[in-house]
Design a protein with these regions (language model features):
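FMN-binding flavodoxin-like domain, especially the glycine-rich phosphate-binding loop
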Residues: 1-8, 12-20, 25-39, 43-167
Length: 167
């Protein structure tokens, strides 16, 4: 399957989830990309079976950000392959990737890949930096390479749900 259209859906108050989601989306190399920024308002998506989607949200306290899930509640897929990405502040992402995968699966998407990337912690300061400057250029290059791996998986017919607990 070669998706013609990708949906890049993210909640990104500090911009870290957006940067990684866009990099993964570039790696998918779809002819058309639709960006759905749920940072300030709820979004509605009606993805089709032949599309692909990237969902990226920050981790708060080991969980997918609750406000992100509320803002993404109206997304719908039709067996649409999805990449789930969580951004964590260099502490732990715990159950966030599983929660996001379950969330999108309940809305008609098939989680075919998952990743956790480090993003600058929201508590980071000049005096007490926590993952300062992340994701950086290397992180975004890795995210784009990850998107290319997913593109190859989809081209080979890989639209089976993965077990995100193994991440």
């Amino acid at each position: 399957m070669k998706p013609a259209k990708s949906w890049i859906c993210y909640f990104s108050p500090t911009g870290t989830s957006r940067r990684v989601a866009e990099a993964v989306g570039r790696g998918l190399n779809c002819a058309q990309t639709i960006v759905c920024d749920a940072t300030h308002d709820a979004v509605s998506v009606a993805a089709e079976r032949g599309d692909a989607a990237v969902f990226a949200v920050p981790v708060y306290g080991g969980h997918a950000a609750p406000l992100a899930l509320r803002r993404l509640d109206a997304v719908r897929g039709d067996g649409t392959p999805a990449v789930v990405v969580v951004l964590y502040g260099n502490r732990a992402y715990e159950h966030a990737a599983c929660e996001l995968a379950d969330f999108v699966a309940a809305r008609g998407f098939v989680p075919v890949a998952a990743a956790a990337f480090v993003g600058e912690h929201s508590y980071s300061t000049a005096r007490w930096p926590i993952a300062a400057g992340r994701p950086d250029g290397d992180d975004c290059a890795e995210a784009e390479a990850f998107g290319r791996v997913v593109e190859a998986k989809l081209a080979a017919g890989g639209v089976r749900a993965i077990d995100v607990k193994r991440l």
